[in-house]
Amino acid sequence: MKFRREGIVIDAIQLNRGNIAKVCDFLGIPDMGNSWRTMNPLRIDVETPEGTTKANELDWIIRGVEGEYYTCEPDIFEQNYEKED
């Protein structure tokens, strides 16, 4: 989905148990099937410019304008981004 912050449009996806395959596709990593779905708590490694970080369930994963990835907690994401039509 597309979101906007201060005029800049980015792609982002929220990590949850119902969209793990889409998150893996978004990140360009293999979907490990049921091993993701049974992980408790749900976490996924995300390669960011600062190194590997973990995205927790309900965190947003943002793809920046140069293709880089960032993670963002849900409350911070909602304060800073709005859905692009």
Please report, for each region that a protein language model flagged, where it lies by residue:
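N-terminal domain-onset segments
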Residues: 1-49
